[in-house]
Amino acid sequence: MSELWRRLGFLAFALLVYRIGTHIPIPGINPEQVAALFQQSQGTILEYFNLFSGGALERMSIFALSVVPYISAAIVMQLFSNSLPYLQELKKDGQAGRNKITQYTRYGTVVFALIQSTALTVTLQSAGLIESSSIFGAIVAVLSIVTGTVFLMWLGEQISERGIGNGISLIIATSIITGVPRAFGQALEQTQQGDLNYLILIVLGLLTLIVVALVVFVENAQRKITVNYAQRHQVRGMVQAPSSFLPLKLNMSGVIPAIFASTFLLFPATLSSWFGNIQGLGGLQEFALYLNPGQPLYILIFVILIVSFCYIWRALTFSSNDMAENLKRSGAYIPGIRPGEQTASFIDMILSRLTVFGAFYLSLVCILPLLLINSFGISFYLGGTSVLIVVVVMLDLQRQIQSYVMSQQYASILKNANISGSKKSRRR
């Protein structure tokens, strides 16, 4: 248990470092004008981006881009790893190949961070938010943001290695959680001013609890496929091996499609919002308004992206042919289904149905609360995507802690058994 507490302590320390970093501003930034800009951007995609950065974008800190460049690079690598022969071979090389792909993802993170930080710096300078308008001032700002992004990527990897849980996911969840008190404060302020009815606030609170319960239920639910094993020979005849099952999650893609879809929407919408302030590019500003959360175009694109990423993620991570081949090699079969192609077709049919359900479930959880909250004029900090990410990440953290505790208990039992066995042998 001491090892578990050490890992939890490292996790808490790393997240504390992250929160401190969100308050370190870019050199030469004008905080008053930045605060005024975000005061005017409430309810827009810019505020949504600020949610994923844990308020770092609003403060224009060195973590302003958060882990968005890393997620963008991870998306590109996932897509390329299934289409480029070189990356396909790396995936088959085991741990060495995965390390190489991780290295390429890091390089991609730096590239995306350079592009996004340059766009952000140019926009800040054109709006007069950076005190120095020189090239040197722009270079310092870009390097500060890129360095902060790379450090955040490294911090996430350290959490995964030395702490517990997925580091990048925990950073995103922490960013969202830190915005919850502010969201409640805004809602209470609206009720005190008479802009929001207390009954509506209670309904929204109940809706949030329902969404949390739905996410917990679906993420823990499984579709079990019964699997039998071939009869094995014994001295006194044939004995039927016990049957088992192949567990498949109802939401096979997890929270990945929602995160990827949000990232894809954040990037073009944010660039449109930034560059729309430049003279001659006013049309981009109008386009950015259509991509604000709750707008019909935003909802349409969001649902399309969620459905697309559900199918893409399933194609990248699940292979019905590989599952059927593994069952055949282990002497297992699905009752009533022939091993081989028929088993692969049956599993593929189940996977297709689960993918449809997962896409519908993710779209419902992400979009429906957003529509209701926006219709009441409340900040979308409590949107379905935010709740989904936080709940799924916390469930994953809980599972990893339980698995770690179980493994430590088994190790302790085996150690005690070896000690007692050695003592008995000495007595003899």
Region locations from a protein language model:
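N-terminal cationic and glycine-rich segments that engage phosphates or anionic surfaces
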Residues: 2-91, 96-428
